[in-house]
Regions:
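Long, compositionally biased intrinsically disordered terminal regions
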Residues: 108-109, 117-223
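Hydrophobic alpha-helical segments that drive targeting, anchoring, or assembly
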Residues: 12-161
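N-terminal acidic, proline/glycine-rich, low-complexity intrinsically disordered segments
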Residues: 1-9
Length: 223
């Protein structure tokens, strides 16, 4: 559980065999107490800190859950954020792609997605509800003119995924772009705390996922 009185440890001293944390962070703009409640139910280890009017949640390690729910980046940025806890913007590198998620009031099908691939640009994975640049700009609190700059940026195809994500965050004036490339720095932010999921939380998550898959198979949604 999150312990506000305990400053998180710096994992940079870990041995060479240590697995790097996922490249993912989520910026939430809801009341701090609601964000804390949301964080406390995460199965992804997180470092959380206030950054201006936002709270940043940075993936500190991969989740202890088994496949196919062992992608900590997607589990963090794709997890639904209640309207009273958001809005929120997620940024992650997953499968060699840059992924942005938009959690805003009025979205009934979960987050909106932006997926960008090097050498290709924007892609449209089937089954995902896409987010538009105007929505992202409004949620970030930027002037309307920022939309054109964001569109031009997302049409580039040369950068690496993490570089694209950092450029998007910088264009939107959002805090924390360096944390995508150096997530252990999150532990050094003022007021940073660490959340590690309990074995009970992980068990509840895996049971809920198993029940959902079983129900969908019974309904014929999954083969």
């Amino acid at each position: 559980m999150t312990t506000p009185s305990t400053r998180p440890t710096d994992d940079r001293a870990a041995g060479p065999a240590s697995v790097p944390p996922p490249t993912a962070l989520l910026l939430l703009r809801g009341p701090r107490e609601r964000v804390a409640g949301w964080v406390s139910r995460s199965v992804v280890p997180l470092v959380v800190a206030p950054v201006g009017r936002w709270t940043v949640a940075v993936a500190a390690a991969g989740p202890p859950t088994g496949p196919p729910y062992d992608d900590g980046a997607l589990l963090l940025v794709g997890r639904p954020v209640p309207a009273r806890t958001g809005p929120a913007l997620g940024f992650s590198e997953t499968g060699g792609r840059a992924v942005i998620t938009v959690h805003a009031a009025g979205r009934r099908r979960g987050p909106g997605w932006v997926v960008w691939e090097p050498g290709v640009g924007l892609v449209r994975p089937p089954g995902l509800d896409l987010a538009g640049p105007g929505e992202i700009v409004r949620l970030a609190g930027c002037p309307a003119r920022t939309r054109e700059e964001l569109v031009d940026l997302l049409h580039e195809t040369g950068p690496r995924p993490v570089t694209m994500l950092q450029a998007v965050m910088a264009t939107l004036g959002l805090p924390g772009p360096r944390l995508l490339q150096d997530p252990v720095r999150a532990a050094e932010l003022p007021g940073a705390t660490r959340h590690d999921p309990s074995a009970r939380q992980v068990s509840w998550f895996e049971d809920a996922v198993a029940d959902s898959v079983r129900l969908r198979r019974e309904l014929g949604v999954l083969e």
